[in-house]
Amino acid sequence: MSLSVFDLFKIGIGPSSSHTVGPMRAAVRFVEGLRREGLLTATTCVKVELYGSLGATGKGHGSDKAVLLGLEGEHPDTVDTETVAARLQEIRGNGRLNLLGEHSIAFNEKEHLAMIRKPLPYHPNGMIFRAFDAAGLQVRSREYYSVGGGFVVDEDAAGADRIVEDATPLTFPFKSAKDLLGHCVKYGLSISQVMLTNESAWRPEAETRAGLLKIWQVMQDCVAAGCRNEGILPGGLKVKRRAAALHRQLCKNPESSLRDPLSVLDWVNLYALAVNEENANGGRVVTAPTNGAAGIIPAVLHYYMRFIPGSNDDGVVRFLLTAAAIGILYKENASISGAEVGCQGEVGVACSMAAGALCEVLGGTVQQVENAAEIGMEHNLGLTCDPIGGLVQVPCIERNAMGSVKAINAVRMALRGDGQHFVSLDKVIRTMRQTGADMKSKYKETARGGLAVNIIEC
């Protein structure tokens, strides 16, 4: 299966790629199917059931809100985040949904949107959408699964190897890190050059570069918003946003702070906190590769652009291409879903992607890039997903800052070596998948274990 850099990096809305972006995409796909089959105007009722992890933590992750917006025709990359609250208030206050913005039906959330903790067979993040006509007859029903990073598959793809419906032939196909590095060594290419060549199967190189710089701009906008916005995050935990205050501290006396040899890490922490606070607030973010881990790649990329001499837009493009190549390996051979393998599949994967990407733009060999990516995951193995209150706040926000610093340190270790390392990237990916399979479900985005049950919500 062919995956693009833009499958890994998607502009979306917080707080969760699997629990917000995925359900919104599934909902709009369902109603678009109604219109395509000529059933939209005949529909008088839509019922939605969210299963497994979606049912357990969907409220905290905004899955219910995402479904309502998706049924009204909104897409994660274009929905106006400033008007979401008002839109939802109108839907709930009037008791009506405007399907695709063109067909109004009655909607009672208590009757028509159910959250069920029991999972469907294929994946912990399952959904069933049903449409009925005026006679109460079911006219359409579809199952969807949000499999991480905003990826959605329907019941026809469930259980199959297919991730997205794309069989585009690539110049340098790869299913493993061994394959990827083999292309690099054989043709004298970097990982980013392999990816850029493959991207030409879908679009001209100039379009790919422009698209990646747009992704980078959204990341910068997200950091800027996080450094500007203050207050309490939604959801009931009363978590205070910290990035704006930290930003003021760092800007107040930047010269004196740089006398501290570790002060750069304060900026890295800031970038990660800013992104994940925006994400927790339902703001505009880039899946990288998920929303729960969306702060790591922007933080490390900001570190590169601000603190590395000679950094430029070409480096940004190379960084994102390399990160995507590594992310594809995890997506195809393991998982990037916290509900499937725990947080090692989100923060762990993002750390690995960022480490490999930074290593390339700092001049690392392909062997050193692989080493950095492997280190990034090896020391996140077993990381649980246990969000307090089902919210993407504690421990998620700080965990992105820790993952960002860990990625930078992984690169420093790799660049001090010759590229030879004991554990291969393929082996650590396989280990992550096996560890996730062995992990109890209470540690996989259900809010029924770990910090989620040991910290009292106040």
PLM region spans:
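Short alpha-helical scaffolding segments that buttress acidic/His motifs in well-ordered protein cores
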Residues: 8, 12, 268-276, 319-327, ...
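Conserved phosphate/anionic-ligand binding catalytic regions in large, soluble enzymes, centered on
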Residues: 9-27, 281-300, 341-352
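Alpha-helical support elements that line or immediately flank enzyme active sites
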Residues: 18-35, 298-310, 355-363
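Accessory "access/gating" subregions that flank catalytic or transport cores
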Residues: 205-342, 450-458
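Extended hydrophobic packing segments that form well-structured cores
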Residues: 422-458
